């Protein structure tokens, strides 16, 4: 078998039967294509992010495993050691459950240190054959195993404590909801589960009935829909884990391009799993002015009552008479349930950034600049639930859109926190109350002499908002914290997505729809 470079810049392999195979290199891995195997070059950022996260996870796991070995005694039962997934060599096991060409598995084997075994699984004969060829092409036969099987069945076969994986990657075409139940069972304690979903129309509220069927939640179209989608997915994963006395710790949650991607650590513990009810809830959303208020499902007792939980008393801050918004008097909607706890681990994200900054230029990944920019924004994000768009709020009251720095400064000068969001370049994420936010725009309207009687219809949301008095002192003086660090450093924060072939690619022919996974089996060709 010989390899040559073709006119397009890719490589071409000519096998003994004279068949030409296109070879593409990404990172340190090469993959050859000559059949209907799914590959999307636009997802290079997704794969680079996964490699970066796994490198940090592997380093953390090795350090933790060494600490556990030092604490280990001769009388310690082996069952506990198996539960914690401590290998004698400290190496990790990875499952690429929907492997397609095997590119992810190959990159993990060549770019992530301390990896002992990788299972590259797929339910397509063509894909498995391609994985086997690519494993040989990259010379990683001692690490990567091509495996034919339904992803759900494969994960269920590895739910035993001594068979679990330290890292499980789910990157399906569309939703990952059908794989979550089996995935949370086959991850080792303190292991990492990495999940992608590309059904953004569902997660962003275009079809609430489909969202309910897939994720057991409902939502509507709103400016912060991408963060809502992330929180819906996290809640679905945590709910699946809770059934097995497990719970999740979100490490990084990203919404970019045409998909959401979450990295969560899976823990085991009945006491902590019960606390999940305090981390989820619904959100009241105004149909007029878009004001929001999260409502937690359960509250935990205090003092000696911490083991007891109760349903909290309903105290709405934006709901008035007739279940209408107190700011604009228009109806309220309720979305959820969603995950209300923090969706990022700031110490983990800081470690990722330090790793990226210390990487020599010659060893940097293909999307290094974008990784640094997005993770810097993530690290600056407040943990407060959801965000507003400053231009949307200005549009409600029909005033000229103020500069984002001016709005941020007014919030900071009032003594509250504010940040942007990696999901949206116009996002305002803050812990300030809604009345202060509307006071800011009432002040803008006052400064620009906006006449609500002439500019706004009397039944509109903006008319009612401008009719209320300003009760807070609004100071637009530039605050030092109003400019984001990522912007100061001129980092790549938001990618232009309108290039050729951008978006999810067509599903490979012969692949099995996720809705049929586990319900039909075909004879595998050995």
Curated annotation (Swiss-Prot):
S-adenosyl-L-methionine binds at residues 47, 104, 122. Changing residue 246 to G: Loss of activity. Zn(2+) binds at residues 286, 289, 325, 328. One of its GO terms (biological process) is tRNA N2-guanine methylation. Residues 22-441 form the Trm1 methyltransferase domain. The keyword Methyltransferase applies. PANTHER family: N 2 ,N 2 -DIMETHYLGUANOSINE TRNA METHYLTRANSFERASE, TRNA (GUANINE(26)-N(2))-DIMETHYLTRANSFERASE. This is tRNA (guanine(26)-N(2))-dimethyltransferase. It comes from Caenorhabditis elegans.
């Amino acid at each position: 078998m010989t390899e040559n470079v073709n006119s397009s810049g890719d490589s071409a392999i000519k096998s003994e039967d004279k068949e030409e195979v296109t070879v593409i290199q990404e990172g340190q891995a090469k993959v050859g294509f000559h059949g209907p195997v799914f590959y999307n070059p636009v997802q290079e950022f997704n794969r680079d992010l996964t490699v970066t996260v796994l490198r940090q996870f592997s380093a953390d796991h090795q350090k933790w495993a060494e600490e556990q070995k030092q604490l280990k005694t001769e009388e310690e039962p082996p069952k506990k050691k198996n539960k914690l997934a401590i290998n004698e060599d400290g190496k990790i096991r990875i499952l690429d459950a929907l492997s397609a060409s095997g590119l992810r598995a190959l990159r993990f084997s060549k770019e992530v240190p301390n990896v002992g075994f990788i299972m590259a699984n797929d339910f397509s004969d063509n894909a498995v054959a391609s994985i086997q060829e690519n494993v040989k092409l990259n010379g990683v036969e001692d690490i990567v195993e091509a495996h034919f099987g339904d992803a759900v069945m494969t994960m269920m076969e590895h739910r035993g404590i001594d068979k679990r994986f330290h890292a499980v990657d789910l990157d399906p075409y569309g939703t990952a909801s059908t794989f979550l139940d089996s995935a949370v069972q086959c991850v080792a304690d303190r292991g990492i589960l990495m999940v992608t979903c590309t059904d953004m129309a569902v997660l962003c509220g275009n079809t609430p009935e489909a969202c309910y069927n897939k994720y057991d939640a409902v939502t509507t179209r709103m400016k912060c829909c991408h963060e809502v989608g992330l929180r819906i997915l996290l809640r679905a994963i945590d709910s699946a884990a809770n059934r097995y006395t497990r719970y999740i710790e979100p490490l990084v949650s990203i919404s970019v391009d045409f998909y959401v991607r979450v990295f969560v650590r899976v823990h085991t513990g009945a006491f902590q799993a019960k606390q999940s009810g305090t981390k989820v809830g619904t959100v009241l959303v105004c149909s007029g002015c878009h004001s929001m208020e999260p409502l937690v499902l359960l509250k935990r007792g205090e003092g000696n009552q911490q083991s007891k939980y109760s349903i909290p008393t309903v105290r709405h801050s934006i709901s008035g008479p007739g279940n209408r918004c107190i700011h604009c008097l228009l109806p309220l909607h309720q979305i959820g349930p969603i995950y209300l706890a923090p969706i990022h681990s700031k110490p983990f994200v800081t470690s990722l950034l330090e790793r990226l900054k210390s990487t020599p230029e010659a060893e940097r990944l293909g999307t290094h600049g974008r990784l640094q920019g997005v993770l810097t924004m993530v690290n600056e994000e407040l943990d407060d639930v959801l965000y507003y768009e400053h231009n949307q709020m200005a549009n409600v009251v029909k005033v000229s859109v103020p500069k984002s720095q001016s709005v941020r400064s007014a919030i900071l000068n009032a003594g509250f926190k504010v940040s942007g969001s990696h999901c949206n370049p116009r996002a305002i994420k803050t812990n300030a109350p809604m009345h202060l936010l509307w006071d800011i725009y009432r002040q803008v309207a006052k400064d620009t002499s906006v006449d609500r009687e002439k500019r706004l219809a009397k039944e509109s949301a903006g008319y009612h908002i401008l009719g209320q008095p300003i009760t807070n002192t609004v100071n637009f003086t530039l605050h030092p914290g109003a400019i984001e660090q990522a912007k100061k450093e001129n980092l790549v924060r938001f990618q232009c997505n309108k290039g050729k072939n951008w978006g999810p690619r067509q599903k490979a022919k012969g692949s099995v729809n996720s809705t049929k996974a586990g319900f039909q089996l075909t004879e595998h060709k050995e």
